[in-house]
Amino acid sequence: MKMVAFVFSHAPHGISLGREGLDAIFSISLIFKKISVFFIGDGVLQLIKNQQPEHILARNYTSSFSILSLYNIKDLYCCKASLLERGLNNNNNFILNIDVLDSYNLRLKLDNYDAIINF
């Protein structure tokens, strides 16, 4: 069975990549059973709770990440270096329970996937 990794590497608001990525995950989950989600670079900002995008006239889609478990998507990973570069750490209260990996182990994990889709 093919394994698909979704990588979120952009900030959540201002562009629609994050929302489109989430929609793609929900669509593809009907076809592929092994899906994992990775947050790297500015993508780690997708994980922050209590965002208020309505102040910039954007829709708060990040709460939709919480229903990933209903689609049996439980492999969620985040880059430790990306967190630290943005003043965050794995003690922050995120919207998801994620495994924080160093850059090396994150790359090793990504190498196992048949397809990697970046948003």
Swiss-Prot record:
Chief site of localization: cytoplasm
One Pfam family hit: DsrE
GO biological process: tRNA processing
InterPro entries: DsrEFH-like (IPR027396), Sulphur_relay_DsrE/F-like (IPR003787), Sulphur_relay_TusC (IPR037450), Sulphur_relay_TusC/DsrF (IPR017462)
GO cellular component: cytoplasm
Protein's cellular compartments: Cytoplasm
Superkingdom, taxonomy of origin: Bacteria
Residues forming coiled coils: none
SUPFAM superfamilies cross-referenced by the UniProt entry: DsrEFH-like
Annotated keywords: Cytoplasm, tRNA processing
Its job: Part of a sulfur-relay system required for 2-thiolation of 5-methylaminomethyl-2-thiouridine (mnm(5)s(2)U) at tRNA wobble positions.
Protein family per UniProt: Belongs to the DsrF/TusC family.
Subunit annotation: Heterohexamer, formed by a dimer of trimers. The hexameric TusBCD complex contains 2 copies each of TusB, TusC and TusD. The TusBCD complex interacts with TusE.
Protein's recorded name: Protein TusC
Gene encoding the protein: tusC
